[in-house]
């Protein structure tokens, strides 16, 4: 066990927040100023982060808004976001030494933020979907999260083609594989 990083992380006491991120930075062997945060508003907007962005959202004010995904090929830039019941999507392109992180809530999932981020990595770095390593964090399950009929209908229209494909759990893995990935592990 390396420490409690979540105590007071969402409190209004900035000193507690900075202390918790300093602890995490120490364990990761980076500086707190290396973190770059999203400005999550449930969009599919992706931003390329570089050295000038380090500290944004933690030790410096964000100079951008409405960003739910970050990509970089710059060593020393630590992509970061906040998650509760939304789904973290991680991407690594070992060929072009680039990474991506997306915050995928129900709106981002519906709008296929995973595919949008993969396309952006292709535009910026030459990433090919078949070269990507993708990871999905654990997420809230359908037993613990109920959606309205209106939201369920939107998902059915976009994702469900037959009874076998039904289920919120399968949407993000399928979304990631659609842009051309040959397979996955796990």
List the predicted regions and their residue ranges:
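Short, exposed "boundary/linker" segments that immediately precede the start
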Residues: 1-4
């Amino acid at each position: 066990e390396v420490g409690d990083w979540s105590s007071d992380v969402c409190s209004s006491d900035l000193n507690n927040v900075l202390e918790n991120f300093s602890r995490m930075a120490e364990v990761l062997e980076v500086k707190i100023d290396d973190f770059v945060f999203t400005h999550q508003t449930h969009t599919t907007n992706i931003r390329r982060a570089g050295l000038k962005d380090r500290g944004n959202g933690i030790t410096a004010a964000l100079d951008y808004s409405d960003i739910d995904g970050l990509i970089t090929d710059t060593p020393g830039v630590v992509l970061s976001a906040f998650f509760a019941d939304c789904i973290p999507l991680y991407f690594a392109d070992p060929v072009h030494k680039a990474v991506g992180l997306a915050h995928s809530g129900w709106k981002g999932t519906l709008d296929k933020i995973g595919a949008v981020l993969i396309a952006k990595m292709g535009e910026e770095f030459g990433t090919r979907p078949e070269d990507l390593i993708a990871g999905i964090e654990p997420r809230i399950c359908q037993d613990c999260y109920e959606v309205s009929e209106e939201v369920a209908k939107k998902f059915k229209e976009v994702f469900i083609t037959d009874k076998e494909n039904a289920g919120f759990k399968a949407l993000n893995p399928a979304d990631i594989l659609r842009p051309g990935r040959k397979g996955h592990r796990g």
